[in-house]
Amino acid sequence: MVEKEEAVISEEEAAQYDRQIRLWGLEAQKRLRTSRVLLVGMRGLGAEVAKNLILAGVKALTLLDHEQVSSEDSRAQFLIPSGSLGQNRAEASLNRARNLNPMVSVEADTENINQKSDDFFTQFDVVCLTSCSRDLLVRVDHICHKHNIKFFTGDVFGYHGYMFADLGEHEFVEEKAKVAKVSKAKQEVEDGPEAKKAKIDPTESILVKKKVQFCPLKDALEIDWHSEKAKSALKKTPTDFFLLQVLMKFRTDKKRDPQPSNYQEDSELLLQICSDVLDSLGVSPDLLPKDFASYCFSEMAPVCAVVGGVLGQEIVKALSQRDAPHNNFFFFDGRSSNGIVDCLGSK
């Protein structure tokens, strides 16, 4: 992880981030202002995450994407101006991204992430990957875990979206209401069950230091569902976890995501992959509904907004070391407008 310089908040920055400083404190904002973030994949979800991080006030954000702007990007990617077809996605997003907050250094990198060396990632405090293959996600997470770099990933497939975090051993502070001390004399006067309960003082709070351990992505994805412990937890596991496994396998096999222009063929392929994946995991073939394939095509802007909001929030929490992080998955189902946080894998 990159060495941190001493944080100094100028008067101009204090005015710019006044609301945030009131919300999570000066020290948390100082940590953000010394943080460097790598964001990979500038599709709809990437645009949402970029917006949230730039407005939060990180020190520097690198947008990495080697792909060109396509007609599908207009569905959810609001940082790319119209008339940008054929341009590099990261470069096309640069101007609007910079205009969101001139105090944040925003740069574009047009190189393919697969060509990046392990050392490339060590210059960042947080690495966030979107629209990447499973093998690449596992590789980059391994690098980040080894070098104590906060790792995040997320994707949106139609009505469905997810995010995952691997923060290694993460320390944070949480604000708790202060327990008011009650004098012995008052306890004797106010005798009874209520008098013995802790008195919460809503006007005062204290910061409590905590520590939590995260597991690597590889462990979270490779759960042995044949074990008795896993079988007992299966009923509580979000079905979107298994949908994610299916969509990752599709991306690995086809080197792309399901395309609306190829709906019939891709729907049939998704059903076949679903059968194979669930069988290999040793879970029921009926775990996913038969019509699941109808709801996981393309990126939907509202789903990108929700997942991007959560993903951006979690990155800010990790960098500022303020409040408990989501450990380790967040799944969102746009059909039911339901979001679930679940901890999967060994710790």
From Swiss-Prot:
InterPro entries: ThiF/MoeB/HesA, ThiF_NAD_FAD-bd, Ubiquitin-activating_enz, UBQ/SUMO-activ_enz_E1-like. GO terms for biological process: protein sumoylation. Pfam families: ThiF. GO terms for molecular function: ubiquitin-like modifier activating enzyme activity. SUPFAM superfamilies: Activating enzymes of the ubiquitin-like proteins (SSF69572). One of its GO terms (cellular component) is SUMO activating enzyme complex. The keyword Ligase applies. It is found in: Nucleus. It comes from the Eukaryota. The keyword Nucleus applies. Pathway: Protein modification; protein sumoylation. Its main location: nucleus. Keywords: Ligase, Nucleus, Ubl conjugation pathway. The heterodimer acts as an E1 ligase for sumo1, sumo2, and sumo3. It mediates ATP-dependent activation of sumo proteins followed by formation of a thioester bond between a sumo protein and a conserved active site cysteine residue on uba2/sae2. Belongs to the ubiquitin-activating E1 family. Heterodimer of sae1 and uba2/sae2. The heterodimer corresponds to the two domains that are encoded on a single polypeptide chain in ubiquitin-activating enzyme E1. Interacts with ube2i. This is SUMO-activating enzyme subunit 1. It comes from Xenopus tropicalis (Western clawed frog). The gene is sae1.
